[in-house]
């Protein structure tokens, strides 16, 4: 068996419906990038603009509802051309790193479509604290620095380094962090690019046997998709579209229903739980499970899924 995936940068919803219709033979799914532009200016990605969660929800919901019963979504936060999601959309500090990585995984893996996990994402690998343009290997980053700093003087060197550390593709292209040995266990020789200095804290060896690790949380999410048809085939409906902190949606398949709640902020946020879920149970959670009740306080970067 084979599947066909079309990398369709700039594709419209109507075009995607034509390319990946379930009753046609062109593609099995489209890989579109509209949600990757939420934290960029219209004509410039080199910025430290933060994501507006309301806009992110609107874009992802457009694709969830627009392809429903017609075509199939690819679900992703990361790839080789994007920075690390835990640094980009959440909080990669030691305090919130693990819950942030698990929250992002919950949000995307509970949607309709096929999730893609980019190498290192399942560990919560982070952006890299580059300090010099000489440390970069990505031509897009190197050329942008030359043009915008040295030739056109649009940004100072300090400004551009800040933007590169946030958005450069090299953030996702450092060696995979296997263990805490030299070069993160990737090689016995010096790699082509620096290893992220946090490799002793974030690596596969440390996480594989830890039941509470980001890695094993991903395993749980993937197992649930194989066990529960509602995660694969259920319809998606957005709740709280105007919330600047909470991404909440439901999945429905027949009489089954799931509620997905994700806090994209470091604030504690009070949320009203829909009545039909108040006597439900947890499917998965990235914090110790609290009592399910009408009003719940959602902790920083908390995520959970309730079954009706």
Can you annotate each of these PLM segments?
Residues 1-281, 285-308:
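Active-site and adjacent substrate-binding regions of carbohydrate-active enzymes
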